[in-house]
Amino acid sequence: MGNSFRSDRVAVEIQREINDILRNKVRDPRVQDVNITDVQLTGDLSQATVYYSLLSNLASDNEKAATALKKATGLFKSELAKRMTIFKIPDLTFAKDESVEYGSKIDEILTWA
């Protein structure tokens, strides 16, 4: 149980730091509208899945953002190493958060009802 609490705390810290790095360090216009919505860590803190949402619904924008995030993974890891006090920075994997789109569809259905 204690390990879960620690991984949750580290995940929240990683989410906050990556959002800050996106706003202040990454100059790539492809990630301008990206927002980090969640981070899921493995129990041993070696892997982190970083979920992001995008303001644009265009498939081309989504692909560009995914490419830019993958390209900036090294920058994220090096900045996290400077900012965080954990022994090993987890390997980062970026995944689009589909729950935002799902919520929008539910809202749309409810407004039609």
Swiss-Prot record:
Transmembrane segments: none annotated. Keywords: Cytoplasm, Ribosome biogenesis. Its main location: cytoplasm. Gene3D superfamilies: 3.30.300.20. GO terms for molecular function: ribosomal small subunit binding. One of its GO terms (biological process) is maturation of SSU-rRNA. GO terms for cellular component: cytosol. It is found in: Cytoplasm. The keyword Cytoplasm applies. InterPro entries: KH_dom-like_a/b, RbfA, RbfA_dom_sf, Ribosome-bd_factorA_CS. Monomer. Binds 30S ribosomal subunits, but not 50S ribosomal subunits or 70S ribosomes. One of several proteins that assist in the late maturation steps of the functional core of the 30S ribosomal subunit. Associates with free 30S ribosomal subunits (but not with 30S subunits that are part of 70S ribosomes or polysomes). Required for efficient processing of 16S rRNA. May interact with the 5'-terminal helix region of 16S rRNA. Belongs to the RbfA family. This is Ribosome-binding factor A. It comes from Lactococcus lactis subsp. cremoris.
